[in-house]
Amino acid sequence: MTYDFDIPVDRRGTWSVQWDGVDRRFGAAGLLPFTISDMDFACPPPVLVALQERVAHGVFGYTDWQNEEFRSAVRDWYRVRHATEIDTGRLVYAPSVLNQLSQLLRMWTEPGDAVVVHTPVYDGFRKAVGGLGRELRGVPLDDPAALEAALARDDSRVLLLCSPHNPTGRVWTEAELAGFAALAERCGVAVISDEIHADFVHDGHRHLPWTRFGRGRWALITSGTKSFNFPALTGSYGVVGEAADHAEFVRRMETGEGLGSPAVLSLVAHIAAYREGGEWLDEVRAYVAGNLSLVADRLNSAFLALSWEPPQAGYLAWIDLRPLGVDDAALQRELVEGERVAIMPGSVYGAPGFVRLNVGCARSKAEAGVGALTRALGRLT
């Protein structure tokens, strides 16, 4: 490999939510964290070089995101990585994917309307939807009948997809996505597809952008910040299907939100990542796949009842512990007090009996995490 991901980067004292903010969520300081979904790896070298060059310029005035360098970087990335043509005339820009989601929900729903999601559900969705006074209507991941029934209800206005799915790492098939599109059209429901994990799909699986399936009212919302690990720079972009909705989104961002000018370093990072970061992304994805295989080997060797398989996308190990019959609260006490690690409980995503272990990190840390989880489970079974 060209890049060495085995060397840990010390993130303590950098205002990191994962490392320095762990005590606020888990009630104890100094824990080894496997929590919020960012990685411990430094950004791709081409991104760092581009940022350094832009900082050296020294002027950070108001910036236009609707420039050809950014548009063409997005267009070419989708063309090469996803064999998909993007209409850059339908691009929008916002500080974050959740910011885009909130804006679209204000456009397409009213307080009290329902937004349908697959469960377990990313907790950011719950906060965004509930915070706007809309109802989050969950349906199980593998229950098409429940999805159809939920979308057919009179107050359902939006199908909110997570593609690939967080927290499970599920990659939707072409048949599934086409089915969602047909069902949404039949029920008169808009579709918002959050595809921030799209570029971290593992071998043997393929992500298909919603632009291939969208009918009527729809939007794809995404960002390079997740796969290339620069979320603190902010910045996201999307594709809005209908011309009138696209114009309305841009108008709202530039007027009501006052967000016409993006963070220039985010634009620089996106362009550099999409133009020169592909090799780094391929290597970090392969490295993380090794971490996930390590987790599977350790867990399944210790607990034959689990038969855990790595996710199809991402660096978050979503682990079903229900076969072991372990109490969630007892497990968290063992992890925090006994092992001094922070691992997200499944209850955060509406799924008691699961945990979500972030292994976007050096192998030594991944080994420490799965080792701690295995020991804690061993004491409780």
Language-model features: where?
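N-terminal small-domain helix-loop-helix segment of the aminotransferase-like
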Residues: 2-96, 103, 273-274, 380-381
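Conserved core of the PLP fold type I
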Residues: 60-183, 199-214, 219, 371
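Conserved glycine-rich beta-strand-loop-beta hairpin in the small C-terminal domain of fold type I
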Residues: 267, 271, 288-296, 308-321
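Helix C-cap/helix->beta junction micro-motif
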Residues: 132, 186-187, 339
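Conserved core segment of the aminotransferase class I/II
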Residues: 216-289
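Hydrophobic residues in well-ordered beta-strands that form the structural core
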Residues: 117, 138, 191-193, 343-345
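PLP-dependent enzyme catalytic core of the Aspartate aminotransferase-like
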Residues: 325, 334-343, 348-381
